[in-house]
A protein has these predicted regions:
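N-terminal juxtamembrane cytosolic/stromal segments of multi-pass membrane proteins
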Residues: 1-60
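Hydrophobic alpha-helical transmembrane segments of multi-pass membrane proteins
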Residues: 18, 88-96, 165-175
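Hydrophobic alpha-helical transmembrane segments of multi-pass integral membrane proteins
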Residues: 50-64, 96, 100, 177
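Hydrophobic alpha-helical transmembrane segments
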Residues: 50-52, 87-92, 99, 122-125, ...
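Juxtamembrane "helix exit" motif at the C-terminal ends of alpha-helical transmembrane segments
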Residues: 58-73, 211-214
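Membrane-interface interhelical loops and short amphipathic "cap" helices
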Residues: 68-85, 148-159, 217
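Membrane-helix interface/capping segments
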Residues: 70-74, 101-115
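Hydrophobic alpha-helical transmembrane segments and adjacent short intramembrane/lumenal linkers
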Residues: 105-106, 114-216
């Protein structure tokens, strides 16, 4: 029984990734450099932590969509459904960012001469989403506490300077994530700032165009 209990505990290496992942917010370069180790053993060690980060970021992302702001406009919608909807929608967003976003980053890096793997590109995207994951525990609780259910329907008291401030902080989290992605590309490839920015810009061009197109309709 003791042996079974010990084997169920996270090893020091596994625990280190649960500490490394949040550390990307304050000391990103060493965390990203650790992604250079792509041995199967090391990839397995960090997988759970990275998927947790991008999963939380996905929930934060879905809460900021126009759909969320009008969710309760439907009379049949219930407040109790919002957490379930946010979780499922966040999971979808996280998977899309991880697989599609990772693929776009991988393709952009290869285009500019990178030799890294698709798996490492996905890990970069996951780690870079840490600011959005952080906003789920900092920005969103305060925003929901201030505006309550009015945040999820139109015509409430959630419009005005205060809401624009929260919106600005939310978009700042996206900007922070983009900056971390540039730092991550530079760290794992050993590239210049210009080449790293170009890689992230090329990878994000298609998603940006799609978002702009959806806004114009």
């Amino acid at each position: 029984m003791a042996t079974t209990a010990e084997s169920a505990r996270p090893s020091p290496l596994e625990r280190s990734w649960w500490l490394r992942a949040p550390a990307v917010l304050v000391a990103p370069r060493p965390v990203f450099v650790a992604l250079r180790d792509e041995s199967e053993h090391e990839v397995d060690r960090r997988q759970d932590a990275l998927m947790t980060v991008i999963g939380l970021a996905g929930i934060s992302g879905v809460l900021g969509t126009p759909v969320a702001r009008t969710f309760l406009n439907d009379p049949s919608a219930s407040v109790s459904i919002i957490p379930v909807w946010a979780f499922l929608g966040g999971a979808f967003y996280a998977l899309a960012a991880y697989w599609v976003g990772g693929g776009l980053l991988f393709g952009a890096a290869r285009r500019l001469g990178g030799l890294g793997s698709y798996r490492r590109a996905r890990s970069l995207v996951a780690l870079a989403s840490a600011p959005l994951a952080l906003s789920l525990f900092t920005l969103w609780p305060v925003r929901i506490a201030v505006y309550g259910v009015n945040l999820f329907r139109t015509g409430g008291d959630d419009w005005g300077p205060g809401d624009r401030t929260f919106g600005g902080l939310y978009y700042a989290a996206f900007g922070w994530s983009a900056l971390l992605l540039v730092i991550g590309v530079r760290a794992v490839h050993g590239w210049s700032w210009g080449r790293s920015v170009a890689t992230v810009g090329l990878a994000s061009s298609l998603p940006v165009l799609l978002v702009l197109a959806s806004r114009l309709h």
